[in-house]
Design a protein with these regions (language model features):
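Secreted/periplasmic proteins
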Residues: 1-105
Length: 105
């Protein structure tokens, strides 16, 4: 497994980020950069540069979820991903911390 760096993800294999976060409160009802409405149940992830709709699989403590890029962000230095509330709930990872991921399903 490779440790990820902030920036453009690479295809192939599992990667680990030290710090992934989630977002939602205060933004529900707003439009995302990819044309959806952010809700508590929207399954997706924000990334700074991946095309909208790109599938990303996240894995945490035996659970996994595959979600599309639905928004832009995160806007905190050193972070690559921001899960939506729906995605973090399904994954059991609604906090800031480490996670594994790979591009695709």
């Amino acid at each position: 497994m490779r440790k990820a760096t902030a920036g453009s993800p690479v295809v192939g294999g599992w990667h680990q980020d030290r710090e992934i976060s989630w977002y939602g409160p205060g933004f529900y009802g707003n439009g995302t950069a990819c044309g959806q409405t952010l809700t508590k149940t929207l399954m997706g992830v924000a990334h700074r540069s991946l095309p909208c709709g790109t599938l990303v699989t996240f894995r945490y403590k035996g659970r996994s979820v595959t979600v599309p890029v639905v928004d832009r962000g995160p806007y905190v230095a050193g972070r690559t991903w921001d899960l939506t509330k729906g995605a973090c709930t399904a994954l059991g990872h609604c906090f800031t911390g480490p996670i594994e991921w790979h591009l695709g399903s």
